[in-house]
UniProtKB/Swiss-Prot annotation:
Active site (catalytic residues): 349
Name of the molecule in the record: Bifunctional protein GlmU
Region (Linker): 233-253
Reactions it catalyzes: alpha-D-glucosamine 1-phosphate + acetyl-CoA = N-acetyl-alpha-D-glucosamine 1-phosphate + CoA + H(+); N-acetyl-alpha-D-glucosamine 1-phosphate + UTP + H(+) = UDP-N-acetyl-alpha-D-glucosamine + diphosphate
Organism: Rhodopseudomonas palustris (strain BisB5)
Region of interest (Pyrophosphorylase), residue spans: 1-232
Length: 452
């Protein structure tokens, strides 16, 4: 089959005023990834597929995010908001370069899939000049209705203009569209603004195609996939749908989720085989969990890798830059950041490990702190393989604890400890025999009321 070229234009110029936020609407996250990023990830990616994003003025943050996600993408500014067709023509320069297929999508529909983009293109290869994505709405009120005659799309009728019979139609316009790229620019240029708002509506392209005797088609998807995000409530609804998808995909791949509805995943979370995630775990962006690992309840993991057969939690926090080796253990109330913890090492309780490397098989006692920040700079702590750090120790970085070395409980270590050595830093213990009894007796006498 001959390879066909495509240009996808993603409209992302909306202010999102109903979000009540200074953050551009398309940069709000779902499953740890901006709305726009989900759409760009789903859009065609091949060598013959181009991408353009239309942004609003003063939305440099959106342009920057676009380049981060898809360095190949171009951005164009829609200086005035005069309707969807006007927005598409902001990328006129890209359209004019030519492509077999022009795809138009929206930056606030994070649930759209790559499969839907592929299905949208198929009718163009079979003779259609325009394809509209539709969905069966549970409540079609407010949506444009797709009027179908036989197997062709006859019109998109807005709610205010629909007849009584047309209002009964539940097949609604999702806004996503594909146009034969050879005629796309000519059709878009023909769209006028003779309406109450004086705007240029992309939906008018259907009528133009019909006037030219060209075929317009509809493909359907489920309503969830084309949810647009305009409010924080809709953002939360999309998050819920996305989480259900991610959990289902994880379980299908063999991950055990205990009470899946309580577990939060990120869009880019990667799992190995036979992973178990207990209740109330939050996994943020940039996390990979290898075969056989167990994440216990109430743990929070972001930007970290967990090795095979490792154990995390309960009540553990793994921050960005944490790398947990095979069979290593992070226990309850432990926080790690920018830390490499090698295979078999144990950090079991009440500990902070930051900017550190813990060698294979080392044991870190309860209450140990790596003191990594001096108020200006971060410093590293190196703990050798097989080392033992006693409870309630403070390791003042930069410092190195050698292979097989011991640190006595309660020590404040400020100097390097050689291999197989013992470091103890604390005052000699003083014992005063009978002192406690005398103290109680003296205190009791002092509390007796004085007689007048």
């Amino acid at each position: 089959m001959t390879t066909r070229t495509s240009l996808t234009i993603v409209l992302a110029a909306g202010e999102g005023t109903r979000m009540r936020s200074s953050l551009p609407k398309v940069l709000h996250p779902v499953a740890g990834r901006p709305l726009l990023a989900h759409v760009l990830a789903a859009a065609p990616h091949g060598a013959d597929d181009k991408l353009a994003v239309v942004i609003g003025p003063d939305h440099q943050a959106v342009a920057d995010e676009t380049k981060r996600i898809r360095p190949d993408a171009e951005t164009f500014v829609q200086s005035e908001r005069l309707g969807t067709a006007h927005a598409v023509l902001a990328a006129k320069q890209a359209i004019a370069r030519g492509a077999d297929e022009l795809l138009i999508a929206f930056g606030d529909t994070p649930l759209i899939s790559a499969e839907t983009f592929a299905r949208l293109r198929e009718p163009l290869r079979n003779g259609s000049a325009l394809v509209v994505l539709g969905f069966r709405a549970a409540d079609p009120t407010g949506y444009g209705r797709l009027v179908v005659e036989g197997d062709q799309l006859a019109a998109i009728r807005e709610q205010a203009d629909a007849s009584a019979d047309e209002l009964k139609i539940t097949l609604c316009n999702a806004g996503v569209m594909a146009i034969d790229g050879r005629i796309a620019l000519d059709v878009l240029a023909q769209i006028g603004n003779a309406n109450k708002k004086g705007e240029y509506y992309l939906t008018d392209a259907v009528g133009i195609m019909r006037e030219r005797g060209l075929r317009a088609s509809v493909i359907e998807t489920d309503e969830d996939e084309v949810r647009g995000i305009n409010t924080k409530a809709q953002l939360a609804e999309a998050e819920a749908v996305m989480q259900t998808r991610l959990r289902q995909a994880a379980m299908t791949a063999g991950v055990t989720l205990i009470s899946p509805e309580t577990i939060h995943l990120a869009a880019d979370t990667r799992f190995g085989k036979d992973v178990t995630i207990e209740q109330f775990v939050v996994i943020g962006p940039g996390v990979s969990i290898a075969d056989g690992a167990v994440i216990h309840s109430f743990s929070h993991i972001v930007g970290a890798s967990v090795g095979s057969n490792a154990s995390v939690g309960p009540y553990a926090r793994l921050r960005p830059g944490t790398s947990l080796g095979d069979g290593a253990k992070i226990g309850n109330f432990v926080e790690t950041k920018a830390a490499r913890i090698d295979a078999g090492a144990k950090v079991n309780h009440l500990t902070y490990i930051g900017d550190a490397h813990i060698g294979e098989g080392a044991n870190i006692g309860a209450g140990t702190i790596t003191c990594n920040y001096d108020g200006f700079n971060k410093h590293r702590t190196e703990i050798g393989a097989g080392a033992f750090i006693g409870s309630n120790s403070s390791l003042v970085a930069p410092v190195k604890i050698g292979v097989g070395a011991y640190v006595g409980s309660g020590s404040v270590v400020t100097k390097n400890v050689p291999d197989d050595s013992l470091a103890v830093e604390r005052n000699d213990q003083t014992v005063r025999v009978g002192w406690a009894k005398r103290f109680r007796e003296t205190s009791a006498r002092a509390r007796k009321p004085k007689t007048s």
